Amino acid sequence: MASITSVVKTSELILKSPLLSKIVVPLAKTYVKFSGYRQLGFKMNDLIIEETPNMQLALRRLPPTESYDRVYRLIRATQFSLSHKLATGNDITKPEEDDHYLIPYILDVEAEAFEKDALDNLEVVKRK
């Protein structure tokens, strides 16, 4: 599985290139439209797998209001799924509301993990 850091770097590369941007951005918007997570009230970052240690740490760093909103969206989507219905009206996540609220925290955690790994594997070389 790719790290969020590599995904962000790839997306920045795609957005910098006019040709790639013209091809990939409409495809991504179409994919998001047909994926259906917004019809359940989710934001895109709600779909990231939670079971990794980095994700657990990033979730703990969320502000309380954002954390409560995330749990509310998960509970509401579960209710929609159990009742075999989709959200209507105000419950649907609009594209302008679908922000990447969790990505900065994940990037910080991954950078810290990378730095920790680099320091843990540091080799001290004795000078002559």
UniProtKB/Swiss-Prot annotation:
Gene3D superfamilies, per database record: Cytochrome b-c1 complex subunit 7
Instruction: Please provide the Gene Ontology terms (biological process) for this protein.
Output: mitochondrial electron transport, ubiquinol to cytochrome c; mitochondrial respiratory chain complex III assembly
Q: Which Pfam families match?
A: UCR_14kD (PF02271)
Gene Ontology terms, cellular component aspect? Answer: matrix side of mitochondrial inner membrane; respiratory chain complex III
InterPro entries (alphabetical): QCR7, QCR7_sf
MF terms (GO), sorted A to Z: ubiquinol-cytochrome-c reductase activity
Q: Give UniProt keywords alphabetically.
A: Electron transport, Membrane, Mitochondrion, Mitochondrion inner membrane, Respiratory chain, Transport
Q: Where in the cell is it found?
A: Mitochondrion inner membrane
What is the recorded membrane topology of this protein? Peripheral membrane protein
Signal peptide segment: none
Q: How does it assemble?
A: Component of the ubiquinol-cytochrome c oxidoreductase (cytochrome b-c1 complex, complex III, CIII), a multisubunit enzyme composed of 3 respiratory subunits cytochrome b, cytochrome c1 and Rieske protein, 2 core protein subunits, and additional low-molecular weight protein subunits. The complex exists as an obligatory dimer and forms supercomplexes (SCs) in the inner mitochondrial membrane with cytochrome c oxidase (complex IV, CIV).
Q: Which PANTHER family match?
A: CYTOCHROME B-C1 COMPLEX SUBUNIT 7, UBIQUINOL-CYTOCHROME C REDUCTASE COMPLEX 14 KD PROTEIN
The record's comment on protein family reads:
Belongs to the UQCRB/QCR7 family.
Q: What function is annotated for this protein?
A: Component of the ubiquinol-cytochrome c oxidoreductase, a multisubunit transmembrane complex that is part of the mitochondrial electron transport chain which drives oxidative phosphorylation.
Stated name of the protein: Cytochrome b-c1 complex subunit 7
Give the classification, highest ranks.
Eukaryota, Fungi, Dikarya, Ascomycota, Saccharomycotina
